[in-house]
Each structure stands twice: as C-alpha cells, then as structure tokens.
C-alpha cells in the first residue's frame, strides 16, 4: 500500500509534552467500526469490559538509555549522543548515534564525562560496527550489572524526539515515563498505553472480574524511526525482543475458550501476542526477536480489543491501528480527535479500538 494513504495533518499544539494527572484522567476515544465515536476518559474503561475478559500488559521497564558523550581525535572533540536500543551482550548495546558521521569504527566515546558514572569511574565504549541510519554497535569497558549501574547513573530518560526537541528531560519524567507495573528492565521507550493505569483503575477492573496478564517486549528506539519508503512493501521493520511465558499463553487461551475478550494494552502487547499466535489463534510460549509489520489486510488472530495512544502520521503504528479497525474508520477517528482537542503521542490521550470484524 502507498504510505501516503496513512498521512494526516496534526497541529503542533496537539502534541502532549506532559501526561495527564492523575494518569487515568486522560481522555479516551472509543472506536467501534460502523458505530458513533464515544468521548470518554480512561477511568471509564471498566464499563466497556465484561467479567472474564483479560487485559494484557507489557511489563517492560524503561532504562535511562540516552547517553551524552564525547569523541576525542587529537585536539578535536566532538559531542556525540547515543540512544541505546537493543542489548547485544553483557558488555554491548546496539545504539543510534547522533551525529553518526563524526565517529568511525574503532574510535572510543566517553560517556558521563561531566562526572563519574559509577564507583569504578567513567563510562567508555568502543564503536565496534556501524550500520544504516546512524546505528552502531557499542562495546563498553564495563559489563553486566556494573554496566547497568553506570548507564543508570549517566543516562537520561529517552524521551521521544517530538518531546525532546521541545524540552529537556527532568526528574518528573523518571516517574511519568514508566508504567506503575514495570519490572523487566530493557526498554528504551515506554509502552505508552500502559501509562494511563493507576491502582484505583486496577481496583475497579478487579471488582468486575477482569483478568490482568503480563508479557514482556523491550521497546526499542526504532519505534520512532520514520517510514521513508513510498510503499509499505519496501519498509524494513525494526526488531524487538519479547517473551510470552507458557502460563500466560495457557491463561489467555482459557479466556478465549470460555468466550472472553483479550484486550491488548498497547501496540507492543498486540505485536508480541500476534507473533506468539498460531494460525488458529492458539497462543503458545514464545521468546525471541519479532519484526512483525502489520498493515491493512492482516488477519488478527490473538486480539479482540486494543487500547492505544494516538500515533504519528505515516507511522507503522498508525498502519497497525488502521489494519485493526479499518483505515477510513481510523482517519475519521483521528480527525475527530484533532477537532475535539485530544492530546497526541506518548504523553497524550488514549483510544479504545474494537476490531473491524468483531
């Protein structure tokens, strides 16, 4: 399909720079294909679910993956920013460098140069490989838990480019850009649909008998990469590591067997479950890298309802929601959201999407 079919105009003022407070006070647009749109708020979610339904959350935890460093070449010093996006070993990470052209393979970058990164000293890495789009493989002097500690001390919250270009990260972001149930460290971007959940909302869902299950997909910085191809067939999707354990797969299969709905909280949960689903829709234990790319025409196997934020024009995620609820339905929904002042992107409002064929 032509990528320009997924384009739309978004006024700059619709981009949220801070989240709603409290989290579950964010607005939520309910989209049922063929039915009128409903303007709600996130804490209304329980009224759209039934006893025995199951919410699936991504429990990945965001690490402070944006590192500022310097590259020395004789008397010349260049400022380099690295955004870690996938761990490649105990002492190495794949990262996007900016500006990548100022660093050659074999050169070293010193991070945390304005102070010690951990009790052992500063955080240094060697550029072992360079790839496309500014990607590089960094091999650090530290390894394992010591490297993790150094990154935590030297790193910044990896806010998305559309926020970071307007303001610096601060201490508030360390809490705001993390779900309340995050536990598996490794993401460099938040699974943002989950940011709306609060203990009170969990209690309300428990009261009506909605199940909660957790999977892990470490969201990479590639989620923000633009689609440069003119046709979706030519786009190369980034890979992310995820896992669905056997107990979770069995529990979700049981939900389906008794007629319950499976609700993915976020596109990361959806992409992971679709990767783990057999053609019949049966879920199995699964782990590994997924580069699943969902566009209109895809037949969903594992998910009935999707809760997700509002996405960028021409993005793979807007393509995904268009596949889920229909392209024309989503264009109409986004037009309504823009007209009604909904807040977009990672810190923005939410939508509750019903599948086109349900």
From Swiss-Prot:
Q: Does the keyword S-adenosyl-L-methionine apply?
A: yes
Q: In which pathway does it act?
A: tRNA modification; tRNA-queuosine biosynthesis
GO cellular component terms attached to this protein's record:
cytoplasm
Per its record, the protein catalyses: 7-aminomethyl-7-carbaguanosine(34) in tRNA + S-adenosyl-L-methionine = epoxyqueuosine(34) in tRNA + adenine + L-methionine + 2 H(+)
On whether Glycoprotein is a keyword of this UniProt record, the answer is no
Q: Where is the signal peptide?
A: none
Keywords of the record: Cytoplasm, Queuosine biosynthesis, S-adenosyl-L-methionine, Transferase
Annotated localization: Cytoplasm
Q: Which residues form a coiled coil?
A: none
Among the GO biological process terms of this entry, one is:
tRNA wobble guanine modification
InterPro entries according to UniProt: QueA, QueA_dom1, QueA_dom2, QueA_sf
Class in the EC hierarchy, top level: transferase
> What is the stated purpose of this protein?
Transfers and isomerizes the ribose moiety from AdoMet to the 7-aminomethyl group of 7-deazaguanine (preQ1-tRNA) to give epoxyqueuosine (oQ-tRNA).
**HAMAP family per the UniProt record, alphabetical:** QueA
Task: Report the sequence similarity comment from the record.
Answer: Belongs to the QueA family.
Q: How does it assemble?
A: Monomer.
Q: What is this protein called?
A: S-adenosylmethionine:tRNA ribosyltransferase-isomerase
Where does this protein come from, organism-wise?
Answer: Chelativorans sp. (strain BNC1)
